[in-house]
Amino acid sequence: MTGLKRGTVMLAPHQEEWAQNAERTIQALNRLLEPVAVDIQHIGSTAIPSIHAKPIIDLVVGVRNLDDIAPYVELLKQHDIVFRGEDVAGQLLFVMGDFEKDTRTHHIHVIKWNGAEWNNYINFRDYLNHFPDKAIEYEACKKKLAAQFADDRWSYTTGKQELIGRLLKEAHTWRSGT
């Protein structure tokens, strides 16, 4: 199952279809954004096979300059990939899903390739995949918050930030080998 009503939180056990779905979507995005996409990666909890995740595929598209994506907004929309704006500073958000049912299946984050946010996404995913105990710690936090905030995605997301910050520091130390 892929997809979740906007604003809600529900975690599901990892499903192999998430990686397959992500790969198909990455291939489609590569075709659509070939001139500007430097790299496209599957990120987020659906990219960590050992943990439960919201059934929404997160992808990150790295570009050299955020302005490079503007000419592609209409083309992406023609392929049911809808621009939602700058969700956080320096990051453009596109979504896919069943908009009539207010369900989202994919969050596509467009950011500066090899910048701080790009490295955060990649390092976090790789760190949790490399260290199962850290993934379990993150999953426990997610499960607790999902039970508490099933209809409040903002509070769920905010509740994870302290742990994510600590794990990111550990991930950067691990990645740099220090």
Q: What are these model-predicted stretches?
A:
Residues 7-9, 55-59, 104-106, 124:
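Short amphipathic alpha-helical segments
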Residues 116-178:
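Catalytic cores of NTP-dependent nucleotidyl/adenyl transfer enzymes across multiple folds
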Residues 29-70:
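Active-site nucleotide-donor binding segment shared across nucleotidyl transfer reactions
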Residues 80-115:
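Conserved catalytic core of two-metal-ion nucleotidyltransferases
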Residues 1-41, 165:
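Helical scaffold of the NTase/Pol beta-like nucleotidyltransferase catalytic core
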Residues 71-79:
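Short amphipathic alpha-helices in soluble, non-transmembrane regions
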Residues 63, 112, 158:
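Conserved residues at beta->alpha junctions
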